[in-house]
Curated annotation (Swiss-Prot):
One of its GO terms (cellular component) is cytosol. Pathway: Amino-acid biosynthesis; L-arginine biosynthesis; L-arginine from L-ornithine and carbamoyl phosphate: step 3/3. The keyword S-adenosyl-L-methionine does not apply. The gene is argH. This is Argininosuccinate lyase. PROSITE patterns: FUMARATE_LYASES.
């Protein structure tokens, strides 16, 4: 049975009875938005400094507010701050404690602002900081991939399409593919950050404020590149959070695909790589097991990131302007995506440099499955045969190989000439794995020379991050 909770609200003047206790708990967000305490205090200090600049506060009042906020920050970080559900959210908790500490001067802090523009500012400050940290983790992971690619620039493995052997590639080339995907992920976060880094503070509830606020000065204090140009838009939209979650879902999708490969490659059926013991776990019943828990969890956590994106899109799709209480539900999906990305990127950045490659196993796998069939077709084309005819000839040679249990390089010259008289002894030069990868010496190709060129370019890009 619901009860009513008495207690003063900072907005309580309009109401004739206290809030129902269940409703109070149901509508409170402090259990999760307290994460924003540093950003809330940072924004409040800048707001107070701006109010002093325009004459709404005296310098003495501003200093008193700053001292009070600094003391509250210290209390929170020591664990000495009692968060109150009755005060609903991080903003009201901090403001109430400020008034308790410094008296009526604290009541002036909220002049010219609303919780609507306040929370939008807090989220942007938080997300900007999170993006910067995530971009650094991406760079760290990319650095590990580049090191691994350089170490294995000439290591031959089977390249796959449809999870069937397709053509030989180098392991270094394969690692650089993941580098390139992460490079686009890094770029998407950098681009998203531009739209995050716009200040909504000063939009107030929805219509702006009659006070002579200097929004550009506040933006300068907080490191924002610009201020919002429409007060309704400033407080009501969360497209910047949706954009971040979309970029996050793509990052997790890339990590999930990479995870799937590592899980397969580490299995006894592939045996291509060995993952470090410290990134794996065992079985409670099967003593032989070494389970790739880190990539499996990253693969699984991708569902969270995808779900958070859909949650935010669904949250926003039916809202009229301007702010609605629905937007309280924006934080948990956003926070969860940040946490999921941070943990997954850290796990991969820590693990990748220590992956052990079983080069001989990969080479043996590449020598099976007719991986050089395309090379034979190209050989025939260079001797004047139309490609479609060459494709047909090689297809028949492959069928013969399947029937006899021989790979193309294992067939005799006489056997190969049964399919085309244009085949000569030099064909065996193109049917080697080394010859196949070396022939792909086009920009972006798998030839070791091209892989090393991409590694040099990547290192040049990563160098500022390492400096």
């Amino acid at each position: 049975m619901s009860t009513q909770h008495s207690g003063d609200k900072l907005w309580g003047g309009r109401f004739s009875e206290p809030t129902d206790a269940f409703v109070e708990a149901f509508t409170a967000s402090v259990s999760f938005d307290q994460r924003l305490y540093r950003h809330d205090i940072q924004g409040s200090k800048a707001h107070a400094r701006m109010l002093a600049r325009v004459g709404v506060l005296t310098e003495e009042e501003c200093d008193k507010i700053h001292d009070g906020l600094d003391a509250i920050l210290a209390d929170i970080e020591r664990g000495d701050f009692a968060w109150s559900v009755e005060l609903e959210d991080v903003h009201m908790n901090v403001e109430a404690r400020l008034i308790e500490r410094i008296g009526d001067v604290g009541k002036k802090l909220h002049t010219g602002r609303s919780r609507n523009d306040q929370v939008a500012t807090d989220i942007r400050l938080y997300l900007r900081e999170a993006i910067d940290a995530l971009m650094q983790e991406i760079r760290r992971l990319q650095g590990g991939l580049v090191d691994l690619a350089e170490r294995e620039a000439q290591t031959i493995m089977p390249g796959f399409t449809h999870l069937q052997t397709a053509q030989p590639v180098t392991f270094g080339h394969h690692m650089m593919a993941w580098y390139e995907m992460l490079e686009r992920d890094h770029g998407r976060l950098a681009d998203c950050r531009k739209r995050v880094n716009v200040l909504p503070l000063g939009a107030a509830a929805l219509a702006g404020t009659p006070y002579p606020l200097d929004r550009h000065y506040t933006a300068e204090l907080l490191g924002f590149d610009a201020v919002t140009d429409n007060s309704l838009d400033a407080v009501s939209d969360r497209d910047f959070a949706i954009e971040f979650c979309a970029a996050g879902a793509l990052i997790m999708t890339h990590l999930s695909r990479f995870s799937e490969e590592l899980i397969l490659w580490a299995s006894a059926q592939f045996g291509f790589v060995d993952l470090p013991d410290r990134f794996c776990t065992g079985s409670s019943i099967m003593p032989q097991k070494k389970n790739p828990d880190v990539p499996e969890l990253v693969r699984g956590k991708t569902g969270r990131a995808n779900g958070n994106l859909i949650a935010l899109l669904t949250l926003m799709k039916g809202q009229p302007l301007a702010y609605n209480k629905d937007n309280q539900e924006d934080k948990e999906p956003l926070f969860d995506t940040v946490d999921t990305l941070a943990g997954s990127l850290r796990a991969f950045a820590d693990m990748v440099p220590h992956i052990q490659v079983r080069a001989e196993v990969m080479r043996a796998a590449a020598s099976r499955g007719f991986a050089t069939a395309t090379d034979l077709a190209d050989y025939l084309v260079r001797r004047g045969m139309p490609f479609r005819d060459a494709h047909e000839v090689v297809g028949r040679a492959v069928r013969h190989g399947v029937e006899t249990g021989k790979d193309l390089a294992e067939m005799s010259l006489d056997e190969l000439r049964k399919f085309s008289k244009t085949i000569e002894q030099d064909v065996f030069e193109v049917l080697t794995l080394e010859g196949s990868v070396a022939a792909r010496n086009v920009h972006g190709g798998t030839a070791p020379a091209q892989v090393r060129a991409r590694i040099r370019a990547a290192r040049a890009k990563l160098m500022p991050a390492k400096g």
